[in-house]
Design a protein with these regions (language model features):
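SAM/dcSAM-binding transferase cores
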Residues: 1-23, 38-44, 63, 216-284
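A short, flexible beta-alpha/helix-coil linker loop
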Residues: 36-40, 151-154, 179, 186
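C-terminal substrate-binding/active-site "lid" region of AdoMet-derived donor-dependent transferases
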Residues: 164-234
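A generic structural signal for alpha->beta connector loops
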Residues: 93-95, 118-120, 176, 203-205, ...
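The AdoMet/dcAdoMet-binding core of the Class I SAM-like
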Residues: 44-171, 187-190, 196
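Short polybasic amphipathic segments
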Residues: 29-33
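Short strand-connecting beta-turns/loops that link adjacent beta-strands
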Residues: 24-26, 175
């Protein structure tokens, strides 16, 4: 039986957002913006994640605290609220906030796939960087997890990739809080190496995980960056790699420094948006 879906909406950027049924996973929806798949949600089982990079982030969420323990989480970029739904399903009682620029997108998501009524999830509208600068004082030092997954269409905007931007995130983290960043990149991995250099400037421990061919710059894809606010060990990282999806490679310590190479931390004046994906990447 097909799912009744709302009509596509035009966002303030002029891009079109729409939901489609996933023909391979019954009861699931895919949110696309400007033809680029942005989010996948399983309406029947929100604790099941589909996209590879989302599964990697899901494993971070599973491992960085005791199983089932409620957390405080801030999501920069809403998409279809896939990860907030996952946290609500796997860590009930968690307190979560989402910052999303596009109010029309939020309305579309709420219509197509409403959040659980009792979920402790609040949505704030606005540009992530602007809203970060005026969050309540009570959120300072209180976030166990901050997820950065910000895209305008298929690119991460430049102003949410700089050291100044991450400088607004750092004070929000609890002493052992974690930041997780989703980045997309291709040949040379210049954007992602710059993100890693920027995070290393702000946080004591950073790890990068992705498919080996993507990390080598031979293929366009997602790379997940993990940064710790205070735990220099991150002793759960080996388990993160083992969780998959596979193949996967993790870069930490000396390997990460060598991979970053000459890439410098990104400043506002040098920031660039992430590269566009190849046109054929999402062809079916």
């Amino acid at each position: 039986m097909s799912i009744r879906l709302p009509d596509p909406v035009t966002l303030s950027s002029g891009l079109v957002a729409e939901f489609e049924e996933d023909r391979w996973v019954p009861g699931s929806l895919v949110l696309s913006v400007d033809g680029t798949p942005q989010s996948h949600i399983n309406l029947r089982s929100p604790d099941e994640l589909f996209f590879e990079y989302i599964r990697r982030i899901g494993h971070v969420i599973d491992l960085f605290r005791a199983p089932g323990e409620p957390i405080s989480a801030l999501h920069l970029g809403g998409g279809a609220f896939t990860l907030p739904r996952y946290i609500e399903a796997t860590r009930p009682g968690s307190r979560q906030q989402i910052i999303e620029l596009e109010s029309a997108l939020v309305a579309l998501v709420r219509e197509a796939a409403p959040l659980p009524k009792r979920a402790g999830i609040r949505v704030r509208h606005g540009d992530a960087r602007d809203v970060l600068g005026r969050l309540p004082a009570g959120m300072q030092g209180a976030m166990d997890l901050v997820v950065v997954d910000i895209f305008a269409g298929s690119q991460t905007p430049a102003h949410v990739s700089s050291s100044e931007f991450y400088g607004l995130i750092a004070p929000l983290l609890a002493p052992d809080g974690v930041v997780v960043v989703n980045a997309t990149d291709g040949t040379g991995q210049a954007f992602t190496r710059g993100q890693a250099a920027t995070l290393r400037e702000r946080f004591p421990e950073v790890a990068v995980i992705g498919e080996p061919q993507v990390l080598k710059g031979r293929r366009f894809g997602n790379v997940v960056l993990v940064a710790s606010a205070g735990d220099p060990e991150l002793d759960w990282l080996p388990r993160l790699l083992a969780c998959g999806p596979h193949p996967a490679r993790m870069l930490v310590g000396r390997e990460l420094r060598e991979w970053i190479g000459t890439a410098a931390p990104v400043r506002d004046e040098s920031a660039m948006p992430s590269p566009l994906p190849p046109r054929e990447l999402f062809d079916v």
